Protein backbone atom coordinates (compact mmCIF):
# COMPACT_ATOMS: atom_id res chain seq x y z
CA UNK A 1 0.00 0.00 0.00
CA UNK A 2 1.45 3.40 -0.98
CA UNK A 3 1.96 6.05 1.70
CA UNK A 4 -1.12 8.07 0.66
CA UNK A 5 -3.46 5.09 0.97
CA UNK A 6 -1.74 3.94 4.16
CA UNK A 7 -2.34 7.31 5.83
CA UNK A 8 -5.93 7.39 4.55
CA UNK A 9 -6.52 3.93 5.99
CA UNK A 10 -5.09 4.97 9.37
CA UNK A 11 -7.20 8.15 9.40
CA UNK A 12 -10.32 6.04 8.77
CA UNK A 13 -9.32 3.74 11.64
CA UNK A 14 -8.80 6.75 13.93
CA UNK A 15 -12.16 8.19 12.89
CA UNK A 16 -13.84 4.93 13.86
CA UNK A 17 -12.02 4.97 17.19
CA UNK A 18 -12.90 8.59 17.95
CA UNK A 19 -16.38 8.94 16.48
CA UNK A 20 -17.48 5.38 15.73
CA UNK A 21 -17.84 6.44 12.08
CA UNK A 22 -15.55 5.45 9.22
CA UNK A 23 -17.86 6.70 6.44
CA UNK A 24 -17.12 10.38 7.11
CA UNK A 25 -13.39 9.77 6.83
CA UNK A 26 -13.83 8.25 3.37
CA UNK A 27 -14.48 11.77 2.10
CA UNK A 28 -11.25 13.16 3.55
CA UNK A 29 -8.43 14.07 1.19
CA UNK A 30 -4.74 13.30 1.50
CA UNK A 31 -2.73 15.84 -0.48
CA UNK A 32 0.82 17.05 -0.90
CA UNK A 33 1.08 20.64 0.44
CA UNK A 34 2.24 23.19 -2.11
CA UNK A 35 4.76 24.49 0.42
CA UNK A 36 7.10 21.84 1.86
CA UNK A 37 7.22 23.98 5.03
CA UNK A 38 3.77 22.52 5.77
CA UNK A 39 5.08 18.96 5.85
CA UNK A 40 4.92 16.06 3.41
CA UNK A 41 1.21 15.28 3.46
CA UNK A 42 -1.91 17.11 4.60
CA UNK A 43 -5.50 16.13 5.37
CA UNK A 44 -8.78 18.03 5.78
CA UNK A 45 -10.39 15.29 7.90
CA UNK A 46 -10.80 17.55 10.95
CA UNK A 47 -12.82 20.14 9.04
CA UNK A 48 -15.06 17.48 7.47
CA UNK A 49 -15.89 15.95 10.85
CA UNK A 50 -16.23 19.37 12.51
CA UNK A 51 -18.86 20.37 9.95
CA UNK A 52 -20.82 17.16 10.61
CA UNK A 53 -20.51 17.31 14.40
CA UNK A 54 -20.75 21.09 14.74
CA UNK A 55 -17.56 21.32 16.81
CA UNK A 56 -14.38 23.41 16.35
CA UNK A 57 -12.12 21.79 13.69
CA UNK A 58 -8.91 22.41 15.67
CA UNK A 59 -10.40 20.49 18.57
CA UNK A 60 -11.03 17.55 16.22
CA UNK A 61 -7.55 17.90 14.71
CA UNK A 62 -5.90 17.68 18.13
CA UNK A 63 -7.72 14.42 18.86
CA UNK A 64 -6.50 12.94 15.58
CA UNK A 65 -2.99 14.20 16.28
CA UNK A 66 -2.88 12.37 19.60
CA UNK A 67 -3.75 9.03 17.95
CA UNK A 68 -1.85 9.39 14.66
CA UNK A 69 1.36 10.53 16.38
CA UNK A 70 1.77 6.92 17.51
CA UNK A 71 2.08 5.60 13.95
CA UNK A 72 5.60 4.28 13.24
CA UNK A 73 6.00 6.13 9.93
CA UNK A 74 5.01 9.57 11.26
CA UNK A 75 7.87 11.90 12.22
CA UNK A 76 5.69 14.81 13.35
CA UNK A 77 2.22 16.32 13.07
CA UNK A 78 1.28 20.01 13.03
CA UNK A 79 -2.14 21.66 13.01
CA UNK A 80 -2.37 24.55 10.54
CA UNK A 81 -4.93 27.21 9.69
CA UNK A 82 -8.55 26.36 10.46
CA UNK A 83 -7.72 22.70 11.12
CA UNK A 84 -5.55 21.15 8.43
CA UNK A 85 -3.46 18.28 9.78
CA UNK A 86 0.05 18.35 8.29
CA UNK A 87 2.21 15.24 8.47
CA UNK A 88 5.96 14.87 8.16
CA UNK A 89 6.88 11.32 7.14
CA UNK A 90 10.01 9.51 8.31
CA UNK A 91 12.68 9.06 5.63
CA UNK A 92 12.70 5.27 5.84
CA UNK A 93 9.00 5.23 4.96
CA UNK A 94 9.74 7.12 1.76
CA UNK A 95 12.48 4.61 1.01
CA UNK A 96 9.85 1.87 1.16
CA UNK A 97 8.37 3.32 -2.03
CA UNK A 98 11.57 2.46 -3.91
CA UNK A 99 11.41 -1.13 -2.66
CA UNK A 100 7.77 -1.46 -3.67
CA UNK A 101 8.40 -0.01 -7.14
CA UNK A 102 11.25 -2.45 -7.73
CA UNK A 103 10.04 -5.54 -5.89
CA UNK A 104 6.29 -5.30 -5.32
CA UNK A 105 4.56 -3.32 -8.05
CA UNK A 106 1.10 -4.69 -7.29
CA UNK A 107 1.41 -3.38 -3.73
CA UNK A 108 2.69 0.00 -4.92
CA UNK A 109 -0.09 0.43 -7.50
CA UNK A 110 -2.87 -0.64 -5.15
CA UNK A 111 -5.68 1.92 -5.41
CA UNK A 112 -9.16 1.73 -3.88
CA UNK A 113 -11.87 2.38 -6.49
CA UNK A 114 -15.61 1.83 -6.70
CA UNK A 115 -15.81 -1.71 -8.08
CA UNK A 116 -19.47 -1.18 -9.03
CA UNK A 117 -18.69 1.61 -11.48
CA UNK A 118 -18.92 0.69 -15.18
CA UNK A 119 -17.62 3.51 -17.35
CA UNK A 120 -18.44 4.19 -21.00
CA UNK A 121 -16.25 6.88 -22.52
CA UNK A 122 -17.13 8.19 -25.98
CA UNK A 123 -14.51 10.17 -27.84
CA UNK A 124 -13.56 11.31 -31.34
CA UNK A 125 -16.92 10.43 -33.01
CA UNK A 126 -15.88 12.50 -36.05
CA UNK A 127 -18.38 12.58 -38.90
CA UNK A 128 -17.32 10.00 -41.52
CA UNK A 129 -17.10 12.66 -44.22
CA UNK A 130 -13.34 13.03 -44.58
CA UNK A 131 -9.91 12.61 -43.01
CA UNK A 132 -9.55 13.58 -39.37
CA UNK A 133 -7.96 16.97 -38.73
CA UNK A 134 -5.51 17.79 -35.96
CA UNK A 135 -8.32 19.23 -33.83
CA UNK A 136 -9.87 15.76 -33.69
CA UNK A 137 -6.51 14.43 -32.51
CA UNK A 138 -6.73 16.39 -29.28
CA UNK A 139 -10.02 14.81 -28.27
CA UNK A 140 -8.78 11.43 -29.48
CA UNK A 141 -5.67 11.57 -27.31
CA UNK A 142 -7.50 13.07 -24.34
CA UNK A 143 -10.18 10.38 -24.42
CA UNK A 144 -7.77 7.52 -25.09
CA UNK A 145 -5.35 8.47 -22.31
CA UNK A 146 -8.17 9.16 -19.86
CA UNK A 147 -9.55 5.69 -20.60
CA UNK A 148 -6.07 4.23 -20.04
CA UNK A 149 -5.83 5.99 -16.68
CA UNK A 150 -9.28 4.83 -15.59
CA UNK A 151 -8.35 1.26 -16.51
CA UNK A 152 -4.99 1.58 -14.78
CA UNK A 153 -6.58 2.50 -11.46
CA UNK A 154 -9.01 -0.40 -11.74
CA UNK A 155 -12.27 0.71 -13.38
CA UNK A 156 -13.99 -1.36 -16.09
CA UNK A 157 -14.04 0.90 -19.16
CA UNK A 158 -15.61 0.72 -22.63
CA UNK A 159 -14.00 3.01 -25.22
CA UNK A 160 -16.58 4.02 -27.81
CA UNK A 161 -16.81 5.86 -31.14
CA UNK A 162 -20.23 7.11 -32.28
CA UNK A 163 -20.47 6.93 -36.07
CA UNK A 164 -22.66 9.83 -37.24
CA UNK A 165 -23.89 8.06 -40.36
CA UNK A 166 -27.48 9.32 -40.49
CA UNK A 167 -27.34 13.12 -40.76
CA UNK A 168 -27.59 15.76 -43.49
CA UNK A 169 -23.80 15.86 -43.86
CA UNK A 170 -23.97 12.26 -45.05
CA UNK A 171 -26.36 13.36 -47.79
CA UNK A 172 -23.79 15.96 -48.87
CA UNK A 173 -21.08 13.31 -48.78
CA UNK A 174 -23.13 11.01 -51.01
CA UNK A 175 -23.81 13.82 -53.48
CA UNK A 176 -20.09 14.62 -53.64
CA UNK A 177 -19.07 10.98 -54.11
CA UNK A 178 -21.60 10.57 -56.94
CA UNK A 179 -19.97 13.54 -58.67
CA UNK A 180 -16.51 12.00 -58.15
CA UNK A 181 -17.91 8.74 -59.53
CA UNK A 182 -19.10 10.53 -62.66
CA UNK A 183 -15.70 12.20 -62.90
CA UNK A 184 -14.00 8.79 -62.75
CA UNK A 185 -16.19 7.72 -65.69
CA UNK A 186 -14.91 10.66 -67.75
CA UNK A 187 -17.47 13.41 -67.09
CA UNK A 188 -16.49 16.99 -66.31
CA UNK A 189 -17.89 17.94 -62.94
CA UNK A 190 -18.36 20.99 -60.74
CA UNK A 191 -18.36 20.63 -56.97
CA UNK A 192 -21.11 23.01 -55.92
CA UNK A 193 -21.09 25.06 -52.73
CA UNK A 194 -22.00 23.07 -49.66
CA UNK A 195 -20.40 19.84 -50.85
CA UNK A 196 -16.92 18.46 -50.09
CA UNK A 197 -14.28 19.69 -52.57
CA UNK A 198 -11.32 17.83 -51.02
CA UNK A 199 -9.31 15.57 -53.30
CA UNK A 200 -9.57 12.75 -50.77
CA UNK A 201 -12.93 11.77 -52.33
CA UNK A 202 -11.44 11.28 -55.82
CA UNK A 203 -10.18 7.74 -55.05
CA UNK A 204 -13.59 6.91 -53.52
CA UNK A 205 -15.27 7.83 -56.81
CA UNK A 206 -12.66 5.82 -58.69
CA UNK A 207 -13.19 2.78 -56.45
CA UNK A 208 -16.94 3.07 -57.00
CA UNK A 209 -16.44 3.20 -60.77
CA UNK A 210 -14.11 0.19 -60.64
CA UNK A 211 -16.66 -1.88 -58.71
CA UNK A 212 -19.86 -0.84 -60.50
CA UNK A 213 -18.73 0.50 -63.86
CA UNK A 214 -21.49 2.76 -65.24
CA UNK A 215 -24.32 0.69 -63.72
CA UNK A 216 -25.12 3.35 -61.13
CA UNK A 217 -25.85 6.03 -63.73
CA UNK A 218 -29.19 4.58 -64.83
CA UNK A 219 -30.13 3.02 -61.50
CA UNK A 220 -33.14 4.09 -59.46
CA UNK A 221 -32.07 7.19 -57.54
CA UNK A 222 -33.05 5.82 -54.13
CA UNK A 223 -31.27 2.52 -54.74
CA UNK A 224 -28.17 4.34 -56.01
CA UNK A 225 -28.19 6.63 -52.98
CA UNK A 226 -28.26 3.64 -50.63
CA UNK A 227 -25.37 1.89 -52.41
CA UNK A 228 -23.21 5.01 -52.57
CA UNK A 229 -24.00 5.93 -48.97
CA UNK A 230 -22.89 2.57 -47.58
CA UNK A 231 -19.84 2.53 -49.85
CA UNK A 232 -18.74 6.08 -48.99
CA UNK A 233 -19.32 5.75 -45.25
CA UNK A 234 -17.31 2.53 -45.11
CA UNK A 235 -14.43 4.12 -47.05
CA UNK A 236 -14.43 7.20 -44.80
CA UNK A 237 -14.73 5.12 -41.65
CA UNK A 238 -11.82 2.95 -42.80
CA UNK A 239 -9.86 6.16 -43.39
CA UNK A 240 -10.69 7.45 -39.91
CA UNK A 241 -9.82 4.10 -38.32
CA UNK A 242 -6.46 4.15 -40.08
CA UNK A 243 -5.81 7.69 -38.79
CA UNK A 244 -6.67 6.56 -35.26
CA UNK A 245 -4.51 3.46 -35.58
CA UNK A 246 -1.53 5.58 -36.58
CA UNK A 247 -2.19 7.75 -33.52
CA UNK A 248 -2.29 4.66 -31.31
CA UNK A 249 -5.94 5.38 -30.44
CA UNK A 250 -8.08 2.30 -29.84
CA UNK A 251 -11.83 1.89 -29.45
CA UNK A 252 -13.72 -1.15 -28.20
CA UNK A 253 -16.96 -0.22 -29.96
CA UNK A 254 -17.87 1.63 -33.17
CA UNK A 255 -21.57 2.39 -32.79
CA UNK A 256 -23.65 3.35 -35.84
CA UNK A 257 -26.25 6.08 -35.44
CA UNK A 258 -28.17 4.56 -38.36
CA UNK A 259 -28.83 1.40 -36.35
CA UNK A 260 -30.85 3.46 -33.88
CA UNK A 261 -33.21 4.32 -36.76
CA UNK A 262 -33.19 0.85 -38.31
CA UNK A 263 -33.85 -0.99 -35.04
CA UNK A 264 -36.62 1.29 -33.81
CA UNK A 265 -34.64 2.34 -30.76
CA UNK A 266 -35.54 6.02 -31.15
CA UNK A 267 -39.26 5.19 -31.11
CA UNK A 268 -38.81 2.97 -28.05
CA UNK A 269 -36.86 5.65 -26.19
CA UNK A 270 -39.40 8.35 -27.03
CA UNK A 271 -42.23 6.06 -25.84
CA UNK A 272 -40.37 5.49 -22.57
CA UNK A 273 -39.93 9.23 -22.05
CA UNK A 274 -43.57 9.82 -23.01
CA UNK A 275 -44.67 7.31 -20.38
CA UNK A 276 -42.47 9.19 -17.89
CA UNK A 277 -44.33 12.41 -18.76
CA UNK A 278 -41.25 14.00 -20.32
CA UNK A 279 -42.51 14.48 -23.91
CA UNK A 280 -45.09 17.15 -24.72
CA UNK A 281 -46.40 19.37 -27.53
CA UNK A 282 -45.00 22.88 -27.44
CA UNK A 283 -42.82 25.44 -29.19
CA UNK A 284 -39.24 26.54 -28.74
CA UNK A 285 -38.14 30.18 -28.48
CA UNK A 286 -36.38 31.78 -31.42
CA UNK A 287 -32.57 31.55 -31.33
CA UNK A 288 -30.90 34.50 -29.63
CA UNK A 289 -29.66 37.25 -31.92
CA UNK A 290 -30.44 37.01 -35.61
CA UNK A 291 -33.27 34.59 -36.37
CA UNK A 292 -32.05 31.64 -38.44
CA UNK A 293 -33.80 31.12 -41.77
CA UNK A 294 -34.61 27.47 -40.95
CA UNK A 295 -36.27 28.36 -37.63
CA UNK A 296 -40.05 28.52 -37.60
CA UNK A 297 -42.52 29.09 -34.82
CA UNK A 298 -44.49 25.85 -34.74
CA UNK A 299 -45.94 23.35 -32.32
CA UNK A 300 -43.74 20.29 -32.06
CA UNK A 301 -42.78 17.38 -29.82
CA UNK A 302 -40.36 18.48 -27.09
CA UNK A 303 -38.34 16.71 -24.42
CA UNK A 304 -38.55 18.34 -20.97
CA UNK A 305 -34.79 18.77 -20.65
CA UNK A 306 -35.21 21.93 -18.53
CA UNK A 307 -36.44 19.64 -15.75
CA UNK A 308 -32.88 18.32 -15.60
CA UNK A 309 -30.96 21.58 -15.85
CA UNK A 310 -30.99 22.39 -19.57
CA UNK A 311 -31.56 25.95 -20.83
CA UNK A 312 -34.57 24.99 -22.94
CA UNK A 313 -36.65 21.97 -23.87
CA UNK A 314 -35.41 20.16 -26.97
CA UNK A 315 -37.29 19.22 -30.17
CA UNK A 316 -37.29 15.55 -31.10
CA UNK A 317 -38.95 15.84 -34.53
CA UNK A 318 -38.29 18.05 -37.53
CA UNK A 319 -41.03 19.78 -39.50
CA UNK A 320 -41.01 16.93 -42.05
CA UNK A 321 -41.71 14.39 -39.31
CA UNK A 322 -38.23 12.88 -39.23
CA UNK A 323 -36.29 12.56 -36.00
CA UNK A 324 -33.92 15.31 -34.91
CA UNK A 325 -30.27 14.62 -34.16
CA UNK A 326 -31.14 15.08 -30.50
CA UNK A 327 -33.68 12.24 -30.70
CA UNK A 328 -30.81 10.00 -31.80
CA UNK A 329 -28.79 11.24 -28.82
CA UNK A 330 -31.61 10.19 -26.50
CA UNK A 331 -31.74 6.69 -27.95
CA UNK A 332 -27.96 6.38 -27.96
CA UNK A 333 -27.70 7.27 -24.26
CA UNK A 334 -30.44 4.74 -23.48
CA UNK A 335 -28.55 2.08 -25.42
CA UNK A 336 -25.36 2.72 -23.42
CA UNK A 337 -27.28 2.41 -20.17
CA UNK A 338 -28.99 -0.78 -21.37
CA UNK A 339 -25.54 -2.24 -22.06
CA UNK A 340 -24.66 -1.82 -18.39
CA UNK A 341 -22.87 1.53 -18.23
CA UNK A 342 -23.59 3.53 -15.07
CA UNK A 343 -21.13 6.36 -15.72
CA UNK A 344 -21.13 8.00 -19.15
CA UNK A 345 -18.27 10.27 -20.20
CA UNK A 346 -18.58 12.32 -23.40
CA UNK A 347 -15.49 13.97 -24.89
CA UNK A 348 -16.49 16.78 -27.26
CA UNK A 349 -14.77 19.44 -29.31
CA UNK A 350 -14.99 23.15 -28.56
CA UNK A 351 -17.65 23.57 -31.26
CA UNK A 352 -19.98 21.32 -29.24
CA UNK A 353 -19.78 23.18 -25.92
CA UNK A 354 -23.46 24.11 -26.30
CA UNK A 355 -24.37 20.43 -26.06
CA UNK A 356 -23.21 19.95 -22.48
CA UNK A 357 -26.46 20.72 -20.66
CA UNK A 358 -28.69 18.79 -23.05
CA UNK A 359 -26.46 15.70 -22.79
CA UNK A 360 -26.46 15.94 -19.00
CA UNK A 361 -30.26 16.28 -19.02
CA UNK A 362 -30.59 13.28 -21.33
CA UNK A 363 -28.57 10.96 -19.09
CA UNK A 364 -30.18 12.20 -15.88
CA UNK A 365 -33.64 11.49 -17.27
CA UNK A 366 -32.92 8.11 -18.84
CA UNK A 367 -30.70 7.00 -15.98
CA UNK A 368 -33.33 8.13 -13.49
CA UNK A 369 -30.65 10.07 -11.60
CA UNK A 370 -28.77 6.78 -10.97
CA UNK A 371 -26.34 7.08 -13.89
CA UNK A 372 -23.51 9.58 -13.60
CA UNK A 373 -22.59 11.77 -16.57
CA UNK A 374 -19.59 13.97 -17.31
CA UNK A 375 -19.06 15.99 -20.48
CA UNK A 376 -15.51 17.15 -21.16
CA UNK A 377 -14.70 19.80 -23.75
CA UNK A 378 -11.40 19.88 -25.61
CA UNK A 379 -10.49 23.36 -26.78
CA UNK A 380 -8.95 24.23 -30.12
CA UNK A 381 -5.45 23.42 -31.32
CA UNK A 382 -3.56 26.28 -32.96
CA UNK A 383 -1.46 24.42 -35.49
CA UNK A 384 1.30 26.43 -37.16
CA UNK A 385 3.43 25.42 -40.13
CA UNK A 386 6.18 27.83 -41.17
CA UNK A 387 4.33 30.55 -39.29
CA UNK A 388 1.18 30.12 -41.38
CA UNK A 389 -1.99 28.79 -39.72
CA UNK A 390 -3.47 25.83 -41.58
CA UNK A 391 -7.18 26.04 -42.33
CA UNK A 392 -9.22 23.22 -40.88
CA UNK A 393 -12.23 22.80 -43.10
CA UNK A 394 -13.21 19.58 -44.84
CA UNK A 395 -15.46 21.58 -47.11
CA UNK A 396 -12.68 23.90 -48.32
CA UNK A 397 -10.41 20.94 -48.88
CA UNK A 398 -7.41 22.52 -47.12
CA UNK A 399 -6.73 21.37 -43.59
CA UNK A 400 -4.04 19.88 -41.39
CA UNK A 401 -4.99 16.23 -41.27
CA UNK A 402 -3.97 13.88 -38.49
CA UNK A 403 -2.13 11.89 -41.14
CA UNK A 404 -0.17 14.97 -42.29
CA UNK A 405 0.98 15.85 -38.78
CA UNK A 406 1.60 12.23 -37.84
CA UNK A 407 3.91 11.78 -40.82
CA UNK A 408 5.66 15.03 -39.92
CA UNK A 409 6.39 14.42 -36.23
CA UNK A 410 5.12 10.93 -35.26
CA UNK A 411 2.38 9.69 -32.96
CA UNK A 412 4.44 9.79 -29.74
CA UNK A 413 5.09 13.52 -30.07
CA UNK A 414 1.45 14.22 -30.93
CA UNK A 415 0.11 12.18 -28.00
CA UNK A 416 2.45 13.74 -25.44
CA UNK A 417 2.12 17.32 -26.68
CA UNK A 418 -1.69 17.13 -26.67
CA UNK A 419 -1.44 16.69 -22.89
CA UNK A 420 0.84 19.63 -22.19
CA UNK A 421 -2.19 21.86 -21.63
CA UNK A 422 -5.42 21.26 -19.76
CA UNK A 423 -8.16 20.13 -22.12
CA UNK A 424 -10.27 23.23 -21.46
CA UNK A 425 -7.50 25.57 -22.63
CA UNK A 426 -6.38 26.34 -26.17
CA UNK A 427 -3.24 24.46 -27.19
CA UNK A 428 -0.49 25.86 -29.42
CA UNK A 429 1.16 23.05 -31.38
CA UNK A 430 4.58 24.26 -32.53
CA UNK A 431 5.98 21.97 -35.21
CA UNK A 432 9.47 23.40 -34.78
CA UNK A 433 9.68 23.11 -30.99
CA UNK A 434 8.36 19.53 -30.84
CA UNK A 435 11.34 18.33 -32.89
CA UNK A 436 14.01 20.21 -30.93
CA UNK A 437 16.42 18.29 -28.72
CA UNK A 438 16.37 20.66 -25.76
CA UNK A 439 14.78 20.96 -22.35
CA UNK A 440 12.32 23.41 -23.90
CA UNK A 441 10.79 20.39 -25.65
CA UNK A 442 8.95 18.46 -22.90
CA UNK A 443 8.73 15.08 -24.62
CA UNK A 444 12.43 15.13 -25.49
CA UNK A 445 13.22 16.07 -21.88
CA UNK A 446 11.20 13.14 -20.52
CA UNK A 447 12.51 10.63 -23.05
CA UNK A 448 16.07 11.81 -22.41
CA UNK A 449 15.58 11.14 -18.69
CA UNK A 450 14.45 7.61 -19.48
CA UNK A 451 17.46 7.01 -21.73
CA UNK A 452 19.81 8.44 -19.09
CA UNK A 453 18.57 6.07 -16.39
CA UNK A 454 19.20 3.11 -18.69
CA UNK A 455 22.63 4.51 -19.51
CA UNK A 456 23.49 4.69 -15.79
CA UNK A 457 22.51 1.05 -15.29
CA UNK A 458 24.39 -0.06 -18.39
CA UNK A 459 27.53 1.82 -17.39
CA UNK A 460 27.41 0.40 -13.85
CA UNK A 461 27.20 -3.13 -15.20
CA UNK A 462 30.48 -2.50 -17.05
CA UNK A 463 32.43 -0.36 -14.58
CA UNK A 464 31.29 -1.50 -11.15
CA UNK A 465 29.72 -4.96 -11.53
CA UNK A 466 29.72 -5.58 -7.77
CA UNK A 467 27.23 -2.74 -7.27
CA UNK A 468 25.17 -3.79 -10.27
CA UNK A 469 24.96 -7.40 -9.12
CA UNK A 470 23.92 -6.33 -5.61
CA UNK A 471 21.27 -4.06 -7.11
CA UNK A 472 19.98 -6.89 -9.34
CA UNK A 473 19.82 -9.19 -6.30
CA UNK A 474 17.75 -6.59 -4.41
CA UNK A 475 20.49 -6.07 -1.85
CA UNK A 476 20.75 -2.33 -1.25
CA UNK A 477 20.76 0.05 1.69
CA UNK A 478 18.28 2.76 0.74
CA UNK A 479 19.00 4.73 3.92
CA UNK A 480 22.13 5.93 2.08
CA UNK A 481 19.83 7.97 -0.16
CA UNK A 482 19.70 10.82 2.31
CA UNK A 483 20.43 14.05 0.45
CA UNK A 484 17.64 16.58 0.15
CA UNK A 485 17.62 16.18 -3.64
CA UNK A 486 17.35 12.39 -3.45
CA UNK A 487 14.55 12.47 -0.88
CA UNK A 488 12.62 14.98 -3.03
CA UNK A 489 12.78 12.63 -6.02
CA UNK A 490 11.77 9.65 -3.87
CA UNK A 491 8.76 11.60 -2.56
CA UNK A 492 7.80 12.37 -6.14
CA UNK A 493 8.13 8.70 -7.12
CA UNK A 494 5.95 7.74 -4.15
CA UNK A 495 3.24 10.13 -5.39
CA UNK A 496 2.90 8.45 -8.81
CA UNK A 497 -0.14 6.38 -7.85
CA UNK A 498 -1.68 9.45 -6.21
CA UNK A 499 -1.18 11.31 -9.49
CA UNK A 500 -2.98 8.55 -11.37
CA UNK A 501 -5.78 8.49 -8.80
CA UNK A 502 -6.24 12.27 -9.00
CA UNK A 503 -6.10 12.26 -12.81
CA UNK A 504 -8.82 9.59 -12.82
CA UNK A 505 -10.94 11.39 -10.23
CA UNK A 506 -10.98 14.73 -12.04
CA UNK A 507 -10.65 13.39 -15.63
CA UNK A 508 -7.39 15.28 -16.10
CA UNK A 509 -4.88 13.18 -18.08
CA UNK A 510 -2.60 16.20 -18.43
CA UNK A 511 -1.57 15.54 -14.82
CA UNK A 512 0.40 12.51 -16.04
CA UNK A 513 2.36 14.57 -18.57
CA UNK A 514 2.99 17.31 -15.99
CA UNK A 515 4.16 14.70 -13.48
CA UNK A 516 6.61 13.18 -15.98
CA UNK A 517 8.01 16.59 -16.89
CA UNK A 518 8.50 17.37 -13.19
CA UNK A 519 10.16 14.00 -12.51
CA UNK A 520 12.45 14.38 -15.52
CA UNK A 521 13.40 17.88 -14.41
CA UNK A 522 14.33 16.75 -10.89
CA UNK A 523 16.27 13.76 -12.22
CA UNK A 524 18.24 15.85 -14.73
CA UNK A 525 19.01 18.37 -11.97
CA UNK A 526 20.35 15.61 -9.72
CA UNK A 527 22.39 14.14 -12.56
CA UNK A 528 23.87 17.56 -13.38
CA UNK A 529 24.59 18.15 -9.69
CA UNK A 530 26.78 15.05 -9.83
CA UNK A 531 28.82 16.65 -12.62
CA UNK A 532 29.65 19.50 -10.25
CA UNK A 533 30.15 17.39 -7.12
CA UNK A 534 31.51 13.83 -7.37
CA UNK A 535 29.75 12.84 -4.14
CA UNK A 536 26.41 13.15 -5.94
CA UNK A 537 27.28 11.00 -8.95
CA UNK A 538 25.11 7.95 -9.49
CA UNK A 539 28.22 5.83 -10.02
CA UNK A 540 31.06 6.25 -7.52
CA UNK A 541 33.60 3.52 -8.18
CA UNK A 542 35.14 3.64 -4.69
CA UNK A 543 31.75 3.50 -2.93
CA UNK A 544 30.01 0.27 -3.84
CA UNK A 545 27.15 0.52 -1.32
CA UNK A 546 26.12 4.07 -2.22
CA UNK A 547 26.34 3.27 -5.93
CA UNK A 548 24.11 0.23 -5.38
CA UNK A 549 21.49 2.38 -3.63
CA UNK A 550 21.62 4.98 -6.40
CA UNK A 551 21.22 2.29 -9.05
CA UNK A 552 18.01 1.30 -7.27
CA UNK A 553 16.92 4.94 -7.41
CA UNK A 554 17.78 5.19 -11.12
CA UNK A 555 15.85 2.00 -11.87
CA UNK A 556 12.82 3.23 -9.92
CA UNK A 557 12.86 6.49 -11.90
CA UNK A 558 13.14 4.52 -15.15
CA UNK A 559 10.20 2.28 -14.24
CA UNK A 560 7.92 5.16 -13.28
CA UNK A 561 8.78 7.16 -16.41
CA UNK A 562 8.10 4.06 -18.51
CA UNK A 563 4.82 3.51 -16.64
CA UNK A 564 3.75 7.11 -17.28
CA UNK A 565 4.66 6.98 -20.96
CA UNK A 566 2.79 3.68 -21.29
CA UNK A 567 -0.35 5.31 -19.87
CA UNK A 568 -0.01 8.15 -22.38
CA UNK A 569 0.56 5.64 -25.17
CA UNK A 570 4.14 6.69 -25.91
CA UNK A 571 6.96 4.21 -26.52
CA UNK A 572 9.81 4.82 -24.02
CA UNK A 573 13.06 5.39 -25.91
CA UNK A 574 16.09 3.28 -25.01
CA UNK A 575 18.66 5.31 -26.92
CA UNK A 576 18.99 8.67 -28.67
Curated annotation (Swiss-Prot):
InterPro entries: aa-tRNA-synth_I_CS, Arg-tRNA-ligase, Arg-tRNA-synth_N, Arg-tRNA-synth_N_sf, ArgRS_core, DALR_anticod-bd, Rossmann-like_a/b/a_fold, tRNAsynth_Ia_anticodon-bd. Keywords: Aminoacyl-tRNA synthetase, ATP-binding, Cytoplasm, Ligase, Nucleotide-binding, Protein biosynthesis. It comes from the Bacteria. Its main location: cytoplasm. The keyword Nucleotide-binding applies. It catalyses: tRNA(Arg) + L-arginine + ATP = L-arginyl-tRNA(Arg) + AMP + diphosphate. A motif ('HIGH' region) lies at residues 126-136. Coiled coil: none annotated. The keyword Ligase applies. It is an enzyme of class 6 (ligase). It is found in: Cytoplasm. This is Arginine--tRNA ligase. It comes from Rickettsia bellii (strain OSU 85-389). The gene is argS.
